[in-house]
Amino acid sequence: MASATFLVQANTALSNTHISLSVAQTQALRSQLKTQRGILNANNINQLCAQLNVTNDALLQGLVPLASEFAVAPVSNFHVGAIVKALDESGEVNFYFGANAEFNRQALSLVVHAEQSAINNAWLNGAKKILKIAISDAPCGYCRQFMNELADAREFDILLPEQQFKLADLLPHSFGPTDLGNQYSLFNPAPQARSFNNTEVEQQLAAYALAAYVPYSQNYSAVKITTFNNGDFYGSYAENAAYSPSLSPLQSALSQLFLAGLSFDQHTVKGITLLETAGHENQAGVAQAVLASFVNLPPLELISAPLSE
């Protein structure tokens, strides 16, 4: 796969049972979402609700088809969208978009699911409590397990086009963090007071690594994707009690780049850096496997740094 490109469906309007936008309104919203990297803040949401005369939840479900447009699905051609409704640090409601991402000629287990993408978007951007998640299609078992790692797993609503559930309805008798003796969870991590003993590590990359949720491997790790003209994109490692549904830092960062409507190719990407915790490294192989799906990218820079005691 030479590149992964966000395809804007020009001259189309978003209209469904929840909301109806004109072509111009739809195009403006698409552009806004790319600029804001897949996030609508409280002001954006309130303005749209007033403009369209709809409720907050109607807007949430009505925008899911736009989330699906961010999908990069060269294998299945099946585009899935998800939007997390969550409270930020100020207690205001934001919408965090997500979509699936696939990688040609690599194991299907490397894909990013739409629910993972939306939750990752909320997590990386400071969301504190998930209230609802609206999805274009029923979540697979993998995604149900990923959601089971969340601090609010038993509380938030899962909204499908025609139905509404709690996670316990979809994942009864579940296996989660407490089964492994882990009292913490995604969005409720263990306190972090350590730092990397390497003064050459970029401060922001280190911050994303230290914010990783890694109770099972202790590999605090993050990825930075540097672009030529569109800034930097970061991703953090998010582990899961079932292990397989864990989200790698490269997948985390790539999902953020795709939500900005950017292509992952040599024309966009200037550099890719993976930071891992010395003695706990486990991400280089996965990162190289994902990158093998693409051509003419800069080489992956690997940094292994010890943590302070």
From Swiss-Prot:
NCBIfam families: PRK09027.1 (NF006537)
Chain ranges of the CMP/dCMP-type deaminase domain: 55-178, 196-309
Gene3D superfamilies found in the cross-reference section: Cytidine Deaminase, domain 2 (3.40.140.10)
EC id: 3.5.4.5
Organism the protein comes from: Pseudoalteromonas translucida (strain TAC 125)
Protein name: Cytidine deaminase
Catalytic activity: cytidine + H2O + H(+) = uridine + NH4(+); 2'-deoxycytidine + H2O + H(+) = 2'-deoxyuridine + NH4(+)
UniProt feature coiled coil, ranges: none
Entry keyword set: Hydrolase, Metal-binding, Zinc
